[in-house]
Amino acid sequence: MQNQKTVKIGNIDVANDKPFTLFAGMNVLESRDLAMRMCETYVEITDRLGIPYVFKASFDKANRSSVHSYRGPGMEEGLKIFQELKDTFGVKIITDIHTEAQAQPVADVVDVIQLPAFLARQTDLVETMARTGAVINVKKPQFMSPDQVGNIVDKFAECGNENIILCERGSCMGYDNLVVDMLGFGVMKKVSNGSPIIFDVTHSLQNRDPSGKASGGRRSQTVELAKAGLATGIAGLFIEAHPTPDKALCDGPSALPLDQLEPFLKQMKALDDLIKGFEHIDIK
């Protein structure tokens, strides 16, 4: 069996052969009060279930389909909210950046910085992120095969940063649809020498109305897709929730209703424990 790397986020060990870590929160920071409420809910539930947890939110959705769509509060206000969440709940935080200038200021506050799928091949951004020394979550682009993510890992390694997590978020299937290749998880483990793989279930559920200006989604299938991913033996799940998904300011159609978070996580933990309790079968 290939050795699996462990990436440490504070006291959390993230690895494909360890209990899954939950990277979850809200798509975009809609308000300070909502962020506080949601983070408190996540922390209470994950503490109760014994699930390692990292809070996720974006301060700027720079790649919205429409110029009129809500993007977020911006970096300065977003980092203030993140710091308050850390001070209040003692939580680890992941957020995404889109420009080189954002890398160090964001890394000074949060625990994991995320390289967006649409920017994953931008070498200057990769180099700047690598130099922060932070843990990096790389979103696999929808247009990239699982084999090619090894090149991104190599770029970070050349810049001296091997604290890399890889995130599956679906692949383009024709126009306006995403599918998840379950064989891809094993391929990404192999080409990255055992780097932790996490599964962005929420964004893998996106689909689009060709005439629309925002992504649609299939949140009714969240449970089955998440279970399928965990069954491959991965390091974590990436989930976005909302108390009222139909009123969310971004990606509501794919968001898990917040009141269903605990029963969802109970099933995910039970499945992950089962899968990782099996003896590995190495088929050549």
Curated annotation (Swiss-Prot):
Cytoplasm is among the record's keywords: yes
Keywords, comma-separated and alphabetical: Cytoplasm, Lipopolysaccharide biosynthesis, Transferase
Gene Ontology cellular component annotations, sorted alphabetically: cytoplasm
Pathway: Carbohydrate biosynthesis; 3-deoxy-D-manno-octulosonate biosynthesis; 3-deoxy-D-manno-octulosonate from D-ribulose 5-phosphate: step 2/3; Bacterial outer membrane biogenesis; lipopolysaccharide biosynthesis
Class of enzymatic activity (EC top level): transferase
Listed EC numbers: 2.5.1.55
UniProt cross-references to PANTHER family, sorted A to Z: PHOSPHO-2-DEHYDRO-3-DEOXYHEPTONATE ALDOLASE
Record-stated family: Belongs to the KdsA family.
Protein name: 2-dehydro-3-deoxyphosphooctonate aldolase
Naturally occurring in which organism (per UniProt): Aliivibrio salmonicida (strain LFI1238) (Vibrio salmonicida (strain LFI1238))
Taxon lineage: Bacteria, Pseudomonadati, Pseudomonadota, Gammaproteobacteria, Vibrionales
